[in-house]
């Protein structure tokens, strides 16, 4: 049975770009268009501060539930990106506070042009269309999230420094005795012989462990506390306490309260 598409839409647009031709628009029913729509949330995300963990008891099951505390720290919309001017829709969001003398003149102009005090953390969040844009200066509060909705949280994991293969990758190591000498925690063989005469890419070795961007998806918002300006999210989140994390509506349509 022949395939429906002999050439992918991406290749068609690439060839059209180099040949100075008008590229064919992505049809609404193509898998590529559906994938692009699914990967971008309707609303922009926010930058929150991880304060630590606590627990609660589920009244229905009687089980203890681990919760992570995420606090709003002067989260505010700074600028917007439009498809007409920039080629995509996005909202620039900032949180915290920073001294003006510690940032560049260009950054100062970006903040002061919207009458916003400089922020410690700044990040762009893509949105699906113009309906998700937020006017600059808008302050995000705990009302932005509702209990029982699901979110995706991205953070920087804790740095562990230089680690060996046993700690970094879970290698079993060599024998503790019976002839083993100076090779108890070594990685062992790292490749073949004359062929291919090199170490293949992706080989697990010792190196820097941690301090990587990781995303935890489909976390349940357990509760919202407007007085303390924080939300409680079920489960753990990467990163140390007092670190900034990026919270967005989950892209999973079946579990999102807004999609």
Swiss-Prot record:
One Pfam family in the UniProt entry: Ribosomal_L3
Record keywords, A-Z: Cytoplasm, Mitochondrion, Ribonucleoprotein, Ribosomal protein, Transit peptide
Residue range covered by the transit peptide: 1-15
Record's compositionally biased regions (Polar residues): 176-197
Alphabetical list of InterPro entries matching this protein: Ribosomal_uL3 (IPR000597), Ribosomal_uL3_bac/org-type (IPR019927), Ribosomal_uL3_CS (IPR019926), Transl_B-barrel_sf (IPR009000)
PROSITE patterns registered for this protein in UniProt: RIBOSOMAL_L3
Annotated spans, Disordered: 176-208
Entry annotated with the keyword Transit peptide: yes
Main localization category: cytoplasm
One GO CC annotation: cytoplasm
Top-level taxon: Eukaryota
A molecular function (GO) term: structural constituent of ribosome
Cystine pairs: none
Subcellular location: Cytoplasm; Mitochondrion
Any GO BP: mitochondrial translation
UniProt keyword Lipoprotein, yes or no: no
Family according to the record: Belongs to the universal ribosomal protein uL3 family.
PANTHER family, A to Z: 50S RIBOSOMAL PROTEIN L3, LARGE RIBOSOMAL SUBUNIT PROTEIN UL3M
Described purpose of this protein according to its UniProt entry: Component of the mitochondrial ribosome (mitoribosome), a dedicated translation machinery responsible for the synthesis of mitochondrial genome-encoded proteins, including at least some of the essential transmembrane subunits of the mitochondrial respiratory chain. The mitoribosomes are attached to the mitochondrial inner membrane and translation products are cotranslationally integrated into the membrane.
Summary of subunit composition and partner proteins: Component of the mitochondrial large ribosomal subunit (mt-LSU). Mature yeast 74S mitochondrial ribosomes consist of a small (37S) and a large (54S) subunit. The 37S small subunit contains a 15S ribosomal RNA (15S mt-rRNA) and at least 32 different proteins. The 54S large subunit contains a 21S rRNA (21S mt-rRNA) and at least 45 different proteins.
Name of the protein: Large ribosomal subunit protein uL3m
Organism field: Schizosaccharomyces pombe (strain 972 / ATCC 24843) (Fission yeast)
Gene field: mrpl9
């Amino acid at each position: 049975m022949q395939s429906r598409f002999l050439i992918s839409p991406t290749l068609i647009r690439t060839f059209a770009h180099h040949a100075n031709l008008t590229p064919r628009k992505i049809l609404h029913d193509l898998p590529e268009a559906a994938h692009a729509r699914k990967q971008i949330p309707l609303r922009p995300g926010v930058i929150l501060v991880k304060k630590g963990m606590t627990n609660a008891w589920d009244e229905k099951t009687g089980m203890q539930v681990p919760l992570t505390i995420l606090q709003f720290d002067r989260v505010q919309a700074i600028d917007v990106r439009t498809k007409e001017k920039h080629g995509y829709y996005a909202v620039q969001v900032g949180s915290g506070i920073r001294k003006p003398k510690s940032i560049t003149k260009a950054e100062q102009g970006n903040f002061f042009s919207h009458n916003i005090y400089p922020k410690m953390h700044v990040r762009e969040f893509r949105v699906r269309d113009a309906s998700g844009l937020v006017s600059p200066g808008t302050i995000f509060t705990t009302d932005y999230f509702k209990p029982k909705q699901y979110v995706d949280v991205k953070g920087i994991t804790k740095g562990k420094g230089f680690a060996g293969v046993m700690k970094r990758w879970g290698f079993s190591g060599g024998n503790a005795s019976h002839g083993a000498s100076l090779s108890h925690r070594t990685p062992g063989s790292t490749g073949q012989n004359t062929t291919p005469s090199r170490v293949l890419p992706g080989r697990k070795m010792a190196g820097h462990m941690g301090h990587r961007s990781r995303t935890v998806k489909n976390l349940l918002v357990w509760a919202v506390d407007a007085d303390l300006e924080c939300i409680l999210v079920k489960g753990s989140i990467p990163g140390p306490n007092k670190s900034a994390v990026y919270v967005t509506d989950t892209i999973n349509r079946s579990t999102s309260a807004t999609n």
